[in-house]
Amino acid sequence: LKMFSNATSIETIAHSLNVSHSSVHNWIKTNLLETIEMDNKIYVKTSSFLDFCHNHLGKNKLNKYANKSLKDTYNHKELTLKYLKKLESSSLLENLGSYYEEELSNTTRNLEGIYYTPNTIVERLFTLPKDFDVSCATFCDPCCGSGNFIMHALKLGFKVENIYGYDIDAFAIALTKERIKERYGIDCPNILQKDFLNLEHTPQFDCIFTNPPWGKKYHKNQKEIFKRRFNLIQSLDSASLFFMASLNCLKENAHLGLLLPESCLNIDVFSEMREIALTFQIKKLMDFNKPFKTLITRAVGLVLTKTPNKTPNNDEKISCFYQDNEFKRSPYSFSNNPKKIFNIHCSSKENEVLDHLFSIPHMTLKDNAHFALGIVTGNNKEKLYSKQERNTIPIFSGSDISKDSLKTPSKFISTDLSQCQQVAPLSLYKAREKIVYKFISSKLVFFCDTKQRLFLNSANMFVLKENFPIQSYTLKELLNSDLMQFIFEKLFRTHKILRKDLECLPLFTQFINDKFDEKTYLECLGIEKLDSKHFAIKS
Protein backbone atom coordinates (compact mmCIF):
# COMPACT_ATOMS: atom_id res chain seq x y z
CA LEU A 1 0.00 0.00 0.00
CA LYS A 2 1.46 3.35 -1.03
CA MET A 3 1.20 6.68 0.69
CA PHE A 4 3.36 9.64 -0.37
CA SER A 5 3.44 12.93 1.53
CA ASN A 6 1.14 14.57 -1.02
CA ALA A 7 -0.72 11.56 -2.41
CA THR A 8 -2.47 8.46 -1.10
CA SER A 9 -3.32 5.31 -3.06
CA ILE A 10 -6.91 4.22 -3.57
CA GLU A 11 -5.98 0.89 -1.95
CA THR A 12 -4.78 2.66 1.22
CA ILE A 13 -7.98 4.73 1.50
CA ALA A 14 -10.21 1.68 0.97
CA HIS A 15 -8.24 -0.29 3.58
CA SER A 16 -8.14 2.50 6.18
CA LEU A 17 -11.89 3.21 5.90
CA ASN A 18 -12.84 -0.46 5.49
CA VAL A 19 -14.74 0.12 2.23
CA SER A 20 -14.52 -1.29 -1.29
CA HIS A 21 -12.38 0.24 -4.04
CA SER A 22 -15.58 1.07 -5.95
CA SER A 23 -16.75 3.28 -3.04
CA VAL A 24 -13.53 5.31 -3.28
CA HIS A 25 -13.94 5.59 -7.07
CA ASN A 26 -17.51 6.86 -6.54
CA TRP A 27 -16.23 9.56 -4.15
CA ILE A 28 -13.70 10.56 -6.82
CA LYS A 29 -16.39 10.65 -9.50
CA THR A 30 -18.61 12.90 -7.38
CA ASN A 31 -15.68 15.26 -6.65
CA LEU A 32 -15.47 14.44 -2.95
CA LEU A 33 -11.86 13.37 -3.49
CA GLU A 34 -9.32 15.11 -5.73
CA THR A 35 -6.88 12.99 -7.75
CA ILE A 36 -3.31 13.32 -8.98
CA GLU A 37 -1.37 11.16 -11.47
CA MET A 38 2.01 9.75 -10.41
CA ASP A 39 4.04 6.99 -12.08
CA ASN A 40 1.22 6.53 -14.61
CA LYS A 41 -1.18 5.72 -11.79
CA ILE A 42 -4.06 7.67 -10.23
CA TYR A 43 -3.67 8.69 -6.56
CA VAL A 44 -5.78 10.85 -4.25
CA LYS A 45 -4.29 14.08 -2.97
CA THR A 46 -3.53 13.57 0.72
CA SER A 47 -4.87 17.03 1.56
CA SER A 48 -8.13 16.14 -0.22
CA PHE A 49 -8.37 12.85 1.68
CA LEU A 50 -7.82 14.56 5.04
CA ASP A 51 -10.39 17.22 4.15
CA PHE A 52 -12.85 14.46 3.18
CA CYS A 53 -12.36 12.70 6.54
CA HIS A 54 -12.84 15.95 8.42
CA ASN A 55 -15.78 17.43 6.51
CA HIS A 56 -17.72 14.55 5.00
CA LEU A 57 -17.49 11.42 7.13
CA GLY A 58 -20.62 11.23 9.23
CA LYS A 59 -22.46 13.85 7.16
CA ASN A 60 -23.21 11.85 4.06
CA LYS A 61 -25.19 8.65 3.49
CA LEU A 62 -22.74 7.79 0.71
CA ASN A 63 -20.05 6.86 3.22
CA LYS A 64 -22.24 5.70 6.10
CA TYR A 65 -20.58 2.29 6.18
CA ALA A 66 -17.07 3.73 6.16
CA ASN A 67 -17.93 6.20 8.89
CA LYS A 68 -19.44 3.46 11.02
CA SER A 69 -16.31 1.34 10.68
CA LEU A 70 -14.04 4.31 11.36
CA LYS A 71 -15.89 5.39 14.50
CA ASP A 72 -16.32 1.89 15.91
CA THR A 73 -13.18 1.55 18.04
CA TYR A 74 -14.46 -1.36 20.04
CA ASN A 75 -11.62 -3.67 21.01
CA HIS A 76 -12.72 -7.26 20.54
CA LYS A 77 -9.62 -8.59 22.30
CA GLU A 78 -10.35 -6.55 25.42
CA LEU A 79 -13.93 -7.85 25.49
CA THR A 80 -12.67 -11.43 25.15
CA LEU A 81 -10.25 -10.97 28.06
CA LYS A 82 -13.00 -9.38 30.15
CA TYR A 83 -15.31 -12.36 29.64
CA LEU A 84 -12.57 -14.94 30.10
CA LYS A 85 -12.08 -13.45 33.58
CA LYS A 86 -15.84 -13.55 34.22
CA LEU A 87 -15.81 -17.20 33.21
CA GLU A 88 -13.58 -18.03 36.16
CA SER A 89 -16.15 -16.87 38.71
CA SER A 90 -19.54 -17.03 36.97
CA SER A 91 -22.11 -19.67 37.84
CA LEU A 92 -24.58 -18.71 35.07
CA LEU A 93 -22.53 -19.99 32.15
CA GLU A 94 -25.40 -20.24 29.66
CA ASN A 95 -26.34 -16.59 30.21
CA LEU A 96 -22.72 -15.47 29.91
CA GLY A 97 -22.74 -16.26 26.18
CA SER A 98 -25.80 -14.04 25.68
CA TYR A 99 -24.21 -11.18 27.61
CA TYR A 100 -21.03 -11.53 25.55
CA GLU A 101 -22.96 -11.46 22.29
CA GLU A 102 -24.89 -8.36 23.40
CA GLU A 103 -21.65 -6.52 24.19
CA LEU A 104 -20.08 -7.29 20.82
CA SER A 105 -20.14 -4.19 18.65
CA ASN A 106 -22.41 -4.28 15.62
CA THR A 107 -19.37 -3.91 13.36
CA THR A 108 -17.67 -6.97 14.87
CA ARG A 109 -20.89 -8.97 14.61
CA ASN A 110 -21.40 -7.99 10.99
CA LEU A 111 -17.79 -8.57 9.94
CA GLU A 112 -17.58 -11.95 11.67
CA GLY A 113 -21.24 -12.94 11.23
CA ILE A 114 -21.61 -13.82 14.93
CA TYR A 115 -25.17 -14.61 16.07
CA TYR A 116 -25.57 -17.26 18.80
CA THR A 117 -28.36 -19.81 18.37
CA PRO A 118 -31.31 -19.81 20.82
CA ASN A 119 -31.95 -23.18 22.49
CA THR A 120 -35.51 -23.31 21.14
CA ILE A 121 -34.13 -23.38 17.59
CA VAL A 122 -31.40 -25.89 18.47
CA GLU A 123 -34.01 -28.34 19.77
CA ARG A 124 -36.26 -28.01 16.70
CA LEU A 125 -33.45 -28.16 14.16
CA PHE A 126 -31.26 -30.82 15.76
CA THR A 127 -33.33 -34.00 15.59
CA LEU A 128 -32.20 -37.44 14.45
CA PRO A 129 -33.99 -40.55 13.14
CA LYS A 130 -35.32 -42.86 15.85
CA ASP A 131 -33.01 -45.68 14.76
CA PHE A 132 -29.86 -43.49 14.88
CA ASP A 133 -27.32 -44.99 17.31
CA VAL A 134 -25.56 -42.17 19.19
CA SER A 135 -23.47 -44.48 21.39
CA CYS A 136 -20.53 -44.64 18.96
CA ALA A 137 -21.39 -41.75 16.65
CA THR A 138 -19.26 -38.62 16.28
CA PHE A 139 -20.72 -35.12 16.39
CA CYS A 140 -19.21 -31.82 15.27
CA ASP A 141 -20.21 -28.17 15.49
CA PRO A 142 -17.81 -26.25 13.18
CA CYS A 143 -18.80 -22.85 14.68
CA CYS A 144 -19.68 -23.78 18.23
CA GLY A 145 -20.24 -20.27 19.64
CA SER A 146 -21.64 -20.57 23.16
CA GLY A 147 -21.97 -24.36 22.77
CA ASN A 148 -25.75 -24.81 22.49
CA PHE A 149 -25.58 -27.43 19.71
CA ILE A 150 -22.86 -29.33 21.57
CA MET A 151 -24.83 -29.32 24.83
CA HIS A 152 -27.84 -30.67 22.94
CA ALA A 153 -25.70 -33.41 21.36
CA LEU A 154 -24.64 -34.50 24.84
CA LYS A 155 -28.28 -34.42 25.93
CA LEU A 156 -29.14 -36.74 23.01
CA GLY A 157 -26.53 -39.23 24.24
CA PHE A 158 -23.37 -38.52 22.25
CA LYS A 159 -20.29 -39.32 24.33
CA VAL A 160 -17.99 -36.47 25.36
CA GLU A 161 -14.99 -38.11 23.67
CA ASN A 162 -16.97 -38.18 20.39
CA ILE A 163 -17.86 -34.49 20.50
CA TYR A 164 -15.87 -32.02 18.37
CA GLY A 165 -16.19 -28.27 18.19
CA TYR A 166 -14.36 -25.45 16.44
CA ASP A 167 -14.47 -21.67 16.66
CA ILE A 168 -12.03 -18.82 16.05
CA ASP A 169 -13.26 -16.95 19.14
CA ALA A 170 -11.24 -17.75 22.28
CA PHE A 171 -14.13 -16.96 24.63
CA ALA A 172 -16.54 -19.20 22.69
CA ILE A 173 -14.15 -22.14 23.05
CA ALA A 174 -13.52 -21.50 26.76
CA LEU A 175 -17.25 -21.10 27.49
CA THR A 176 -18.21 -24.31 25.66
CA LYS A 177 -15.53 -26.32 27.48
CA GLU A 178 -16.57 -24.89 30.84
CA ARG A 179 -20.26 -25.65 30.22
CA ILE A 180 -19.42 -29.30 29.45
CA LYS A 181 -17.23 -29.57 32.54
CA GLU A 182 -19.87 -27.97 34.78
CA ARG A 183 -22.68 -30.24 33.51
CA TYR A 184 -20.82 -33.55 33.11
CA GLY A 185 -17.65 -33.11 35.19
CA ILE A 186 -15.47 -34.09 32.22
CA ASP A 187 -12.93 -32.16 30.16
CA CYS A 188 -13.65 -32.18 26.41
CA PRO A 189 -10.30 -32.18 24.57
CA ASN A 190 -11.81 -31.87 21.10
CA ILE A 191 -13.16 -28.30 21.44
CA LEU A 192 -10.50 -26.33 19.58
CA GLN A 193 -9.80 -22.71 18.64
CA LYS A 194 -9.40 -23.31 14.92
CA ASP A 195 -10.91 -22.06 11.68
CA PHE A 196 -12.99 -24.94 10.31
CA LEU A 197 -12.57 -23.64 6.75
CA ASN A 198 -8.79 -23.94 7.04
CA LEU A 199 -8.29 -27.29 8.79
CA GLU A 200 -5.11 -29.08 7.70
CA HIS A 201 -6.97 -32.37 7.33
CA THR A 202 -10.58 -33.39 6.61
CA PRO A 203 -12.00 -35.23 9.64
CA GLN A 204 -15.07 -37.40 9.05
CA PHE A 205 -18.14 -37.13 11.29
CA ASP A 206 -21.48 -38.90 11.60
CA CYS A 207 -23.35 -35.73 12.44
CA ILE A 208 -22.81 -31.98 11.95
CA PHE A 209 -25.28 -29.38 13.20
CA THR A 210 -24.29 -25.73 13.30
CA ASN A 211 -25.14 -22.07 12.85
CA PRO A 212 -22.39 -20.83 10.50
CA PRO A 213 -21.39 -17.15 10.27
CA TRP A 214 -23.83 -15.11 8.21
CA GLY A 215 -22.29 -12.77 5.66
CA LYS A 216 -18.80 -12.81 7.15
CA LYS A 217 -16.44 -10.54 5.22
CA TYR A 218 -13.49 -12.20 3.48
CA HIS A 219 -10.63 -10.62 1.54
CA LYS A 220 -10.49 -11.20 -2.19
CA ASN A 221 -7.48 -13.53 -1.99
CA GLN A 222 -9.25 -15.64 0.67
CA LYS A 223 -12.28 -15.97 -1.61
CA GLU A 224 -10.06 -17.21 -4.44
CA ILE A 225 -8.56 -19.88 -2.16
CA PHE A 226 -12.02 -20.99 -1.01
CA LYS A 227 -13.31 -21.03 -4.59
CA ARG A 228 -10.62 -23.55 -5.55
CA ARG A 229 -10.82 -25.56 -2.31
CA PHE A 230 -14.59 -26.08 -2.41
CA ASN A 231 -14.99 -26.05 -6.20
CA LEU A 232 -17.51 -23.19 -6.11
CA ILE A 233 -18.18 -20.74 -8.90
CA GLN A 234 -20.38 -18.06 -7.33
CA SER A 235 -21.61 -19.07 -3.85
CA LEU A 236 -18.77 -17.59 -1.80
CA ASP A 237 -20.80 -16.30 1.13
CA SER A 238 -19.69 -17.70 4.51
CA ALA A 239 -22.91 -19.74 4.78
CA SER A 240 -22.15 -21.51 1.48
CA LEU A 241 -18.52 -22.07 2.43
CA PHE A 242 -19.43 -23.74 5.73
CA PHE A 243 -22.07 -25.80 3.91
CA MET A 244 -19.42 -27.16 1.53
CA ALA A 245 -16.80 -27.64 4.27
CA SER A 246 -19.35 -29.52 6.39
CA LEU A 247 -20.31 -31.80 3.48
CA ASN A 248 -16.64 -32.60 2.94
CA CYS A 249 -16.31 -33.60 6.61
CA LEU A 250 -19.35 -35.90 6.64
CA LYS A 251 -19.27 -39.67 6.22
CA GLU A 252 -21.60 -41.26 3.69
CA ASN A 253 -25.23 -41.31 4.93
CA ALA A 254 -24.29 -38.89 7.74
CA HIS A 255 -26.55 -36.07 8.95
CA LEU A 256 -26.16 -32.32 8.39
CA GLY A 257 -28.21 -29.46 9.82
CA LEU A 258 -27.57 -25.76 9.26
CA LEU A 259 -29.23 -22.57 10.49
CA LEU A 260 -29.03 -20.14 7.58
CA PRO A 261 -30.20 -16.69 6.48
CA GLU A 262 -33.42 -16.88 4.44
CA SER A 263 -31.55 -15.59 1.39
CA CYS A 264 -29.98 -19.06 1.04
CA LEU A 265 -33.40 -20.32 -0.05
CA ASN A 266 -34.20 -17.83 -2.78
CA ILE A 267 -31.38 -15.46 -3.77
CA ASP A 268 -29.56 -16.07 -7.05
CA VAL A 269 -26.06 -16.13 -5.52
CA PHE A 270 -27.00 -19.23 -3.47
CA SER A 271 -28.43 -21.21 -6.42
CA GLU A 272 -25.23 -23.26 -6.65
CA MET A 273 -25.55 -24.23 -2.98
CA ARG A 274 -29.21 -25.23 -3.48
CA GLU A 275 -28.33 -27.30 -6.53
CA ILE A 276 -25.69 -29.21 -4.54
CA ALA A 277 -28.12 -29.74 -1.63
CA LEU A 278 -30.64 -31.27 -4.04
CA THR A 279 -28.14 -33.96 -5.01
CA PHE A 280 -28.56 -35.33 -1.47
CA GLN A 281 -31.64 -36.38 0.50
CA ILE A 282 -33.07 -33.22 2.06
CA LYS A 283 -35.18 -34.10 5.09
CA LYS A 284 -36.40 -30.74 6.42
CA LEU A 285 -36.62 -27.09 5.41
CA MET A 286 -37.75 -24.90 8.29
CA ASP A 287 -38.67 -21.25 8.76
CA PHE A 288 -37.63 -19.72 12.12
CA ASN A 289 -38.87 -16.16 11.53
CA LYS A 290 -36.51 -13.48 12.96
CA PRO A 291 -34.75 -14.97 16.01
CA PHE A 292 -31.92 -12.43 16.39
CA LYS A 293 -32.64 -9.08 18.05
CA THR A 294 -30.23 -7.03 15.96
CA LEU A 295 -31.10 -8.64 12.61
CA ILE A 296 -34.16 -8.12 10.44
CA THR A 297 -33.19 -11.21 8.45
CA ARG A 298 -35.33 -14.32 8.76
CA ALA A 299 -33.60 -17.59 9.71
CA VAL A 300 -34.19 -20.96 8.08
CA GLY A 301 -33.09 -24.50 8.79
CA LEU A 302 -31.77 -27.04 6.29
CA VAL A 303 -31.44 -30.71 7.34
CA LEU A 304 -30.17 -33.40 4.98
CA THR A 305 -28.43 -36.76 4.92
CA LYS A 306 -25.34 -37.25 2.78
CA THR A 307 -27.07 -39.92 0.75
CA PRO A 308 -27.20 -39.36 -3.03
CA ASN A 309 -30.61 -38.37 -4.34
CA LYS A 310 -30.22 -40.59 -7.39
CA THR A 311 -33.32 -39.64 -9.35
CA PRO A 312 -34.83 -36.18 -9.81
CA ASN A 313 -38.28 -37.73 -9.37
CA ASN A 314 -37.42 -39.32 -6.03
CA ASP A 315 -40.71 -39.81 -4.18
CA GLU A 316 -39.29 -39.22 -0.70
CA LYS A 317 -40.91 -35.99 0.43
CA ILE A 318 -39.23 -33.05 2.15
CA SER A 319 -40.95 -31.73 5.29
CA CYS A 320 -41.37 -27.95 4.95
CA PHE A 321 -42.25 -25.96 8.05
CA TYR A 322 -43.47 -22.41 7.46
CA GLN A 323 -45.09 -20.40 10.26
CA ASP A 324 -47.72 -22.79 11.69
CA ASN A 325 -47.99 -24.92 8.56
CA GLU A 326 -46.25 -28.13 7.51
CA PHE A 327 -46.13 -29.12 3.85
CA LYS A 328 -44.70 -32.20 2.17
CA ARG A 329 -42.87 -31.32 -1.03
CA SER A 330 -40.98 -33.48 -3.51
CA PRO A 331 -37.34 -32.61 -4.31
CA TYR A 332 -38.47 -32.25 -7.93
CA SER A 333 -40.80 -29.40 -6.99
CA PHE A 334 -37.72 -27.38 -5.97
CA SER A 335 -35.35 -28.51 -8.73
CA ASN A 336 -38.04 -27.55 -11.26
CA ASN A 337 -38.17 -23.97 -9.93
CA PRO A 338 -36.16 -21.19 -11.59
CA LYS A 339 -32.71 -21.03 -9.94
CA LYS A 340 -33.71 -24.09 -7.82
CA ILE A 341 -35.53 -21.78 -5.40
CA PHE A 342 -36.61 -23.39 -2.11
CA ASN A 343 -40.01 -21.67 -1.80
CA ILE A 344 -41.00 -23.36 1.46
CA HIS A 345 -43.79 -20.82 2.03
CA CYS A 346 -45.59 -22.32 -0.97
CA SER A 347 -47.98 -25.21 -0.25
CA SER A 348 -48.04 -28.41 -2.30
CA LYS A 349 -51.27 -27.31 -4.03
CA GLU A 350 -49.88 -23.87 -4.86
CA ASN A 351 -46.70 -25.42 -6.19
CA GLU A 352 -48.73 -27.70 -8.46
CA VAL A 353 -50.08 -24.53 -10.09
CA LEU A 354 -46.52 -23.25 -10.60
CA ASP A 355 -45.38 -26.59 -12.05
CA HIS A 356 -48.38 -26.58 -14.39
CA LEU A 357 -47.63 -23.05 -15.61
CA PHE A 358 -43.92 -23.64 -16.17
CA SER A 359 -44.72 -26.80 -18.16
CA ILE A 360 -46.53 -24.67 -20.79
CA PRO A 361 -44.31 -23.12 -23.51
CA HIS A 362 -43.50 -19.54 -22.58
CA MET A 363 -41.02 -16.75 -23.04
CA THR A 364 -39.38 -14.48 -20.45
CA LEU A 365 -37.85 -11.02 -20.32
CA LYS A 366 -34.34 -12.52 -20.31
CA ASP A 367 -32.55 -11.34 -23.48
CA ASN A 368 -35.77 -9.65 -24.61
CA ALA A 369 -35.42 -6.28 -22.88
CA HIS A 370 -32.83 -3.62 -22.09
CA PHE A 371 -32.85 -3.02 -18.31
CA ALA A 372 -31.72 0.15 -16.57
CA LEU A 373 -31.39 1.31 -12.98
CA GLY A 374 -32.84 4.57 -11.78
CA ILE A 375 -30.46 7.49 -11.27
CA VAL A 376 -28.16 7.45 -8.22
CA THR A 377 -27.36 11.08 -7.39
CA GLY A 378 -24.73 10.35 -4.73
CA ASN A 379 -26.32 12.98 -2.49
CA ASN A 380 -30.06 13.61 -2.77
CA LYS A 381 -29.97 16.57 -0.37
CA GLU A 382 -27.54 18.46 -2.57
CA LYS A 383 -28.74 17.40 -6.00
CA LEU A 384 -32.53 17.32 -5.68
CA TYR A 385 -34.79 20.37 -5.42
CA SER A 386 -38.25 20.54 -3.87
CA LYS A 387 -39.52 22.96 -6.53
CA GLN A 388 -38.73 23.52 -10.17
CA GLU A 389 -35.94 25.99 -10.79
CA ARG A 390 -34.06 27.11 -13.87
CA ASN A 391 -32.42 24.21 -15.76
CA THR A 392 -34.14 21.54 -13.67
CA ILE A 393 -36.61 18.85 -14.68
CA PRO A 394 -38.96 16.57 -12.71
CA ILE A 395 -37.61 13.27 -11.41
CA PHE A 396 -39.77 10.53 -9.90
CA SER A 397 -39.14 7.93 -7.20
CA GLY A 398 -40.55 4.44 -6.67
CA SER A 399 -43.20 5.74 -4.27
CA ASP A 400 -44.58 7.94 -7.07
CA ILE A 401 -45.45 4.92 -9.23
CA SER A 402 -48.86 3.29 -9.32
CA LYS A 403 -50.20 0.87 -11.93
CA ASP A 404 -52.00 3.48 -14.00
CA SER A 405 -50.42 6.81 -13.13
CA LEU A 406 -47.62 8.80 -11.52
CA LYS A 407 -47.97 11.23 -8.66
CA THR A 408 -47.45 14.93 -9.32
CA PRO A 409 -43.66 15.47 -9.27
CA SER A 410 -42.28 16.67 -5.93
CA LYS A 411 -38.56 16.42 -6.78
CA PHE A 412 -36.50 18.10 -9.48
CA ILE A 413 -32.97 17.59 -10.75
CA SER A 414 -30.50 19.53 -12.88
CA THR A 415 -30.66 18.83 -16.61
CA ASP A 416 -26.89 18.22 -16.38
CA LEU A 417 -26.64 14.68 -15.00
CA SER A 418 -22.85 14.42 -15.31
CA GLN A 419 -22.33 14.98 -11.57
CA CYS A 420 -24.59 12.11 -10.56
CA GLN A 421 -22.97 8.97 -9.22
CA GLN A 422 -24.75 6.53 -11.55
CA VAL A 423 -26.71 7.19 -14.72
CA ALA A 424 -27.81 4.59 -17.28
CA PRO A 425 -27.52 5.38 -21.01
CA LEU A 426 -29.82 8.34 -21.68
CA SER A 427 -31.31 6.49 -24.66
CA LEU A 428 -33.09 4.18 -22.21
CA TYR A 429 -34.55 7.04 -20.14
CA LYS A 430 -35.56 8.79 -23.37
CA ALA A 431 -37.05 5.72 -25.09
CA ARG A 432 -40.41 6.22 -26.81
CA GLU A 433 -41.91 3.66 -24.41
CA LYS A 434 -40.39 2.19 -21.28
CA ILE A 435 -41.80 0.19 -18.39
CA VAL A 436 -40.84 1.46 -14.94
CA TYR A 437 -41.43 -0.37 -11.68
CA LYS A 438 -41.02 -0.01 -7.94
CA PHE A 439 -37.76 -1.54 -6.75
CA ILE A 440 -38.36 -1.67 -2.97
CA SER A 441 -41.66 -3.51 -2.84
CA SER A 442 -43.19 -6.93 -2.25
CA LYS A 443 -45.92 -6.11 -4.79
CA LEU A 444 -45.42 -5.85 -8.53
CA VAL A 445 -46.21 -2.29 -9.61
CA PHE A 446 -45.46 -1.42 -13.25
CA PHE A 447 -46.16 1.76 -15.21
CA CYS A 448 -45.74 2.40 -18.93
CA ASP A 449 -43.98 5.74 -19.44
CA THR A 450 -44.36 7.41 -22.84
CA LYS A 451 -43.13 10.88 -21.83
CA GLN A 452 -39.40 10.16 -21.38
CA ARG A 453 -39.42 10.95 -17.66
CA LEU A 454 -36.46 10.48 -15.28
CA PHE A 455 -36.55 8.19 -12.23
CA LEU A 456 -34.44 7.79 -9.10
CA ASN A 457 -32.94 4.44 -8.10
CA SER A 458 -35.96 3.47 -5.98
CA ALA A 459 -37.43 2.70 -9.40
CA ASN A 460 -35.95 0.61 -12.19
CA MET A 461 -37.02 0.21 -15.80
CA PHE A 462 -36.69 -1.71 -19.03
CA VAL A 463 -37.25 -1.12 -22.73
CA LEU A 464 -38.53 -4.02 -24.83
CA LYS A 465 -36.48 -5.14 -27.80
CA GLU A 466 -37.98 -4.51 -31.23
CA ASN A 467 -39.28 -7.98 -32.01
CA PHE A 468 -41.10 -8.53 -28.71
CA PRO A 469 -44.51 -10.00 -29.64
CA ILE A 470 -46.73 -7.68 -27.56
CA GLN A 471 -46.75 -3.93 -26.90
CA SER A 472 -45.28 -2.33 -23.77
CA TYR A 473 -48.66 -1.21 -22.46
CA THR A 474 -50.10 -4.72 -22.88
CA LEU A 475 -47.10 -6.25 -21.09
CA LYS A 476 -47.54 -3.72 -18.29
CA GLU A 477 -51.13 -4.91 -17.84
CA LEU A 478 -49.98 -8.54 -17.74
CA LEU A 479 -47.24 -7.84 -15.19
CA ASN A 480 -49.71 -6.00 -12.95
CA SER A 481 -52.19 -8.90 -13.03
CA ASP A 482 -53.14 -11.00 -10.00
CA LEU A 483 -51.72 -14.13 -11.64
CA MET A 484 -48.25 -12.57 -12.04
CA GLN A 485 -48.37 -11.38 -8.44
CA PHE A 486 -49.26 -14.94 -7.38
CA ILE A 487 -46.34 -16.42 -9.34
CA PHE A 488 -43.93 -13.79 -8.00
CA GLU A 489 -45.00 -14.24 -4.36
CA LYS A 490 -45.02 -18.03 -4.46
CA LEU A 491 -41.57 -18.16 -6.02
CA PHE A 492 -39.59 -15.29 -4.55
CA ARG A 493 -41.36 -13.69 -1.56
CA THR A 494 -38.88 -10.81 -1.42
CA HIS A 495 -39.19 -7.11 -0.65
CA LYS A 496 -37.14 -6.11 -3.67
CA ILE A 497 -38.14 -6.51 -7.30
CA LEU A 498 -34.88 -7.84 -8.74
CA ARG A 499 -34.11 -7.95 -12.44
CA LYS A 500 -33.03 -11.62 -12.30
CA ASP A 501 -36.35 -12.53 -10.69
CA LEU A 502 -38.36 -10.62 -13.29
CA GLU A 503 -36.40 -12.41 -16.01
CA CYS A 504 -37.69 -15.75 -14.66
CA LEU A 505 -41.41 -14.93 -14.80
CA PRO A 506 -43.25 -16.93 -17.49
CA LEU A 507 -44.93 -14.84 -20.20
CA PHE A 508 -47.51 -16.69 -22.29
CA THR A 509 -47.64 -14.13 -25.08
CA GLN A 510 -49.19 -16.68 -27.48
CA PHE A 511 -52.47 -16.19 -25.60
CA ILE A 512 -52.49 -12.38 -25.91
CA ASN A 513 -53.64 -10.32 -28.87
CA ASP A 514 -53.74 -6.52 -28.84
CA LYS A 515 -54.99 -6.25 -25.26
CA PHE A 516 -54.48 -8.31 -22.13
CA ASP A 517 -57.70 -10.03 -21.08
CA GLU A 518 -57.26 -11.91 -17.80
CA LYS A 519 -60.27 -14.19 -18.27
CA THR A 520 -59.15 -15.39 -21.71
CA TYR A 521 -55.55 -15.71 -20.53
CA LEU A 522 -56.50 -17.96 -17.59
CA GLU A 523 -58.79 -20.10 -19.75
CA CYS A 524 -55.98 -20.72 -22.23
CA LEU A 525 -53.69 -21.70 -19.34
CA GLY A 526 -56.23 -24.06 -17.78
CA ILE A 527 -56.15 -22.05 -14.56
CA GLU A 528 -59.08 -21.05 -12.34
CA LYS A 529 -59.02 -17.85 -10.25
CA LEU A 530 -60.47 -18.56 -6.79
CA ASP A 531 -59.91 -14.98 -5.60
CA SER A 532 -57.27 -12.28 -6.15
CA LYS A 533 -54.62 -14.26 -4.22
CA HIS A 534 -55.51 -17.89 -4.97
CA PHE A 535 -55.44 -19.92 -8.16
CA ALA A 536 -55.99 -23.60 -8.97
CA ILE A 537 -55.61 -25.94 -11.93
CA LYS A 538 -58.95 -26.44 -13.66
CA SER A 539 -60.27 -29.93 -13.04
Tell me the role of every PLM-derived stretch.
Residues 185-196:
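Conserved SAM-binding strand-loop segment of SAM-dependent methyltransferases
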Residues 2-3, 32, 43-182, 195, ...:
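Class I S-adenosyl-L-methionine
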Residues 21, 26, 353-539:
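Polybasic, glycine- and aromatic-enriched phosphate-binding surface used to engage nucleic acids
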Residues 1-23:
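Polyanion-binding surface elements
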Residues 18-42:
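Major-groove DNA-recognition helix of helix-turn-helix-type DNA-binding domains
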Residues 36, 192, 286:
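General small-molecule cofactor/ligand-binding pocket signal
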Residues 120-121, 144, 148-150, 160, ...:
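Signature of N6-adenine DNA methyltransferases within the class I
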